[in-house]
A protein has these predicted regions:
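C-terminal catalytic/substrate-binding lobe primarily of soluble NAD(P)-dependent oxidoreductases
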Residues: 151-403
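Rossmann-fold NAD(P)-binding glycine/threonine-rich loop
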Residues: 109-132
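Helix N-cap at the beta1-alpha1 junction of Rossmann-like dinucleotide-binding domains, i.e.
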Residues: 35-39, 113
Length: 403
């Protein structure tokens, strides 16, 4: 049995602990740590319910701790096989450094590019595996895109698209908070890594808007930061790019969302990271935009995740196109409703932990998501979250449905 520490018991952190215990089939003992007792209390309710839903025994500890305190974090890390960091991106580098120092394998779901580069620097002196960006996007999307790209000799255009959306949109933004509002605003403000004309570069977020439809539903997609992960450099190393290749990641939303967010973040200047106070003492910056979203945009469990990869390139001398699409709705599992964004993000990082335990990922060093083949990912029970979420409960012998 492997001892795994999950730092952060927010909405998705709780789900990571629960899913690892549910689908790990007794392979893991989980310690879930957070400084908010309310989060731990909710986690206990979920895990006590899980005990009644699965046939195998589950072992866990819930620890109230200040995860911003380096000494407390090091104490929690002692004797652990792995740590999954579910904290805001500003905590990531410190946790990764401590984990590497103590010989604890490191995983996170961060989308922040600068933070990931700091993890890569730590990995230059790696004692363990350091595996950042393990969620949905970045994360699974790179695995899926690599699976499409490997079918081509050279790539003309590869577009990765992911959206976590409300099933029922009723406000002008056509958006509900289903993920970290701070993470969303960060993605909408930071530069976006792309390849244009065969050259790796950056473009501003909220640009490159395109419109498309699936199954009668209209969507838009636009550049956002972080989702492409390390895929561009991997495809360059694989010699699949040409002097005209275009590769990019875009976030999917309902039409009209991008324009309104540009109004808030750019025209109203709420995208500033460190704004100076006005004469009245008010500060108009990203923190205010995050607060506005959390105040006004209701949360929902009735969400849907859309994954769409399209690739045009050359195969055996012919120009072809291959598409990949998955649509995941919120699902009843283990006695409760799992929002799609929680399930897919948790499944992404849990799968990578499981594959490392099984020796199917590098034992040490910086590990890219696309180093995991899609077929290998889907061989874990966590792959069902993307392929057939309704079958997850049956796969682990669950008896429970949401009450």
């Amino acid at each position: 049995m492997k001892n795994v520490l999950v730092l952060g018991a927010g909405k998705v952190g709780k789900s990571v602990a629960e899913l690892l215990l549910a689908c790990g089939m007794g392979a893991y003992r989980v310690t879930l740590a957070d400084r908010a007792q309310a989060n731990l209390d909710e986690a206990r309710q979920n895990l006590d319910r899980l005990k009644k839903s699965v046939p195998h025994a589950i072992e866990f500890d819930l620890v109230k701790a200040d995860v911003s305190d380096a000494a407390q974090v090091r104490t929690l890390l002692q004797g652990k096989y792995a740590v999954i960091c579910m904290l805001p991106f500003n905590f990531v580098a410190g946790i990764a450094d401590a984990a590497n120092d103590l010989g604890v394998h490191y995983f996170d779901v961060t989308e922040d590019v600068e933070t990931t580069e700091r993890v890569r620097e730590i990995a230059k002196n790696a004692k363990v595996a350091l595996v950042p960006q393990c969620g949905l996007a970045p994360g699974y999307i790179a695995i899926a895109a690599q699976d499409v790209a490997r079918r081509f000799d050279t790539i003309d255009e590869l577009i990765l698209r992911v959206g976590a959306l409300p099933q029922y949109s009723t406000n002008a933004l056509k958006y509900n908070v289903t993920w970290s509002a701070a993470g969303v605003v960060n993605e909408y403000c930071e530069p976006c890594n792309v390849m244009l004309d065969g050259r790796a570069t950056t473009v501003p977020a909220l640009e490159g808007v395109e419109n498309f439809a699936f199954e009668g539903v209209d969507y838009e997609a636009f550049y956002t930061s972080g989702g492409v992960g390390t895929l561009i450099e991997s495809l360059i190393e694989q010699k699949r790019t040409t002097p005209t290749s275009m590769i990019a990641y875009k976030t999917i939303r309902y039409p009209g969302h991008c324009g309104l967010m540009k109004f808030l973040l750019q025209d109203m200047r709420l995208g500033a990271e460190h704004a100076q106070p006005t004469p009245s003492g008010r500060v108009f910056d990203r923190a205010l935009c995050v607060e506005m979203l959390e105040h006004a945009a209701p949360r929902t469990e009735q969400d849907v995740v859309v994954v769409f990869v399209s690739c045009i390139g050359t195969r055996q001398g012919r120009r072809e196109q291959i598409n990949f699409k998955r649509t995941i709705h919120s699902t009843e599992l283990f006695g409760r409703v799992w929002p799609a964004i929680e399930l897919t993000t948790a499944a992404g990082v849990c799968a990578m932990v499981d594959l490392h335990r099984l020796g199917k990922l590098p034992a040490r060093g910086f590990v890219r998501q696309e180093q995991c083949a899609l077929d290998t990912f889907n061989q874990t029970p966590f792959g069902l979250a993307y392929e057939n979420p309704g079958a997850l409960a049956a796969a682990v012998g669950s008896k429970g449905k949401a009450s």
